[in-house]
Structures are given as C-alpha cells and as structure tokens.
Amino acid sequence: MRRLYLFVLILATFLTTSHGIVDASQDFQHLRRGLQEEAGEDEERIKLSGFKLPKSFGKRFKQKLSTKTKAFATRAASRMFQKKKGPLYGKYYKNAGKPKRQTPQIAATGPAKPKVQSPEEAAAVPGPYGQSLEYRVAQKVPLREREAFNPAKLSKINEMIPV
C-alpha cells in the first residue's frame, strides 16, 4: 500500500510540473479517493468471505533471495531426487517403471459358477490347467481332510492293498 501511495505522490509531483499546482492537487485528491474506495471494497469482500491473511503475509514478499541461494536450492533439490529422498520422490519416481494395477475384467458370460464343496462335485468340474483329479480335490477340501486326498499317500495306500 505504501508503494502505491508513493507512486501516486510521484505521479502528483510530475503532474504539478506539467499542468500546474491546482490541477495536480485536484487530480491527486481524485486518485487518492479512488484508491481508498477500492481498498475499502477489497477489505469488505475479504471480511465477508471470512478469509484472514496471516501476519507474515507482507514479510514473505519482501524477502528476496540472491542468485547464490537460488542456485544452492536448485542443487539441493536435484541432489534429493538423485538420492531418492524427499517428499516428491515417491510420488513421481518410485513407481515409474512399474505397471499400474489393473482391475480384473469380469466376463459377462452369464451367472458365476457355484463353489464346489464335496469331492464328488470337484471331480465333475474340469481342471483349468489339466491338473490331476487328486490335486484338484485336495485344493477344494479343507485342511484337515486333505491328507486323505494327497496323491503321494494315495499311491502308498494303493501299494499296501494286496491285489
């Protein structure tokens, strides 16, 4: 606001040299009134919206960084990315080579197949990868009952049975 006020003052002095003191003072008063009205409208708008500016708002813009500090900051940022650290690394670089997770496509070929519960029903269902019947049955049966359908144990039992 001060800078704007100084600018208007300088403008007024410039006008005094070119137009005369009376015209310049009238122009200056007109400009000042217009600026005050605009500032008042802005303040009212901000108050109505409930937005409050922080106290350090003006200070942040006054601080100017030298070229050395800017160069240092950019170098530090590039080092962070090289070392795979920093807040943005994971977001952009960590998952760069990995394919995105794809949702399984649900085929619209009719109702879903019912789950097989008994070994007899399991035997009736064809295997997806050409597995043996015993293996497919063992996959469907609970853990306690799996030993009875274990192919290795079945072959041992078959050897024990006299022909």
From Swiss-Prot:
Keywords: Host cytoplasm, Host nucleus, Secreted, Signal, Virulence. A motif (RxLR-dEER) lies at residues 33-45. Its main location: secreted. Residues 1-20 form the signal peptide. It is found in: Secreted; Host nucleus; Host cytoplasm. GO terms for cellular component: extracellular region; host cell cytoplasm; host cell nucleus. The keyword Hydrolase does not apply. Belongs to the RxLR effector family. The RxLR-dEER motif acts to carry the protein into the host cell cytoplasm through binding to cell surface phosphatidylinositol-3-phosphate. This is Secreted RxLR effector protein 135.
